[in-house]
Design a protein with these regions (language model features):
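Short glycine-enriched, charge-decorated loop/helix-capping segments at active-site entrances
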Residues: 18-27, 91-92, 110, 211
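Active-site-proximal alpha-helix that buttresses catalytic centers in soluble enzyme cores
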Residues: 2, 6-7, 12-72
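Generic structural signal for well-ordered alpha-helical scaffold segments
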Residues: 37-44, 124, 128-139, 161
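Phosphate-handling substructures
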Residues: 69-129, 196-199, 208, 221, ...
Length: 237
């Protein structure tokens, strides 16, 4: 299965440079609503089977146009909710830069635990477990490779992508997840493949749709690379 990790559109908190965290009622701003509408066009023609989202309002608003267009009822999963930033929640980013913990978040995020909140290592653990669980469930339900969307938050996406890359959490700040961006991971029996990171372009198509199989055709023909293996030298498609 292939998951499209969709970050919510730009929010009213993004606009004023505060850390929204799990604050109730943080909605999309005007640009964010435009981004949500544009997601439908960006994913046109892709066989998306399911949408899973964070319980927070900005994620609900982001997937509403897509869910309506596809006739899907999004599933809410608390495990892909925003980081619980504790007492950092609602504060100006410019003020947080002055906190001693800021340097830890930047340089050793695996050790960062937000005061009154949770640690980034726990965020990665819960989010990766959720994504992999949904991926297995949907693979069984749809008997093979298909696409699904998980609408979540920037640090959550970065943590999941780091896991898929086999990168230590302490390097996850090297990954970017802009508002309304899409990062794509294909999970196989042996390993994940990271197809896109922070895609913000018009259409998301390359490498996402599996080639249709002919009835009775073997999973892998002689001379073909198994789907769970990487092509030595790079893809030839």
């Amino acid at each position: 299965m292939t998951v499209i990790l969709l970050r919510h559109g730009r929010s009213t908190s993004n606009t004023v440079h505060t850390l929204a965290g799990r604050t109730d009622g943080v909605d999309l701003d005007d640009k964010g609503r435009e981004q949500a509408q544009a997601i439908v066009e960006r994913l046109t023609g892709l066989p998306i089977r399911a949408i899973v989202r964070s319980p927070l309002l900005r994620c609900r608003r982001t997937v509403e146009p897509l869910a309506a267009a596809l006739g899907l009822d999004p599933l809410v999963d608390e495990r892909i909710s925003e980081v619980d930033y504790g007492s950092w929640t609602g504060r100006k980013i410019g003020d947080l830069v002055k906190e001693p913990l800021w340097a830890v978040v930047q340089q050793q995020p695996s050790a960062a635990v937000f005061p009154g909140g949770e640690g980034l290592a726990h965020v990665q653990s819960r989010a990766v477990a959720a994504v992999r669980e949904h991926d297995r469930r949907l693979a069984e339900l749809h008997e093979g490779d298909a696409l699904w969307v998980a609408c979540t938050h920037g640090d959550v996406i970065k943590a999941v992508v780091a896991d898929a890359l086999g990168t230590h959490l302490d390097s996850f700040q090297r990954i970017t997840a802009d508002p309304a961006s899409m990062s794509v991971i294909r999970y196989t029996a042996l390993r994940p493949f990271v197809i896109h990171v922070n895609h913000t372009g018009a259409a998301l198509t390359a490498g996402l749709v599996a080639k249709p199989k002919v009835d009775g055709e073997a999973e892998t023909k002689d001379g073909e690379v198994p789907p769970e293996d990487a092509v030595v030298g790079g893809s030839t498609d």
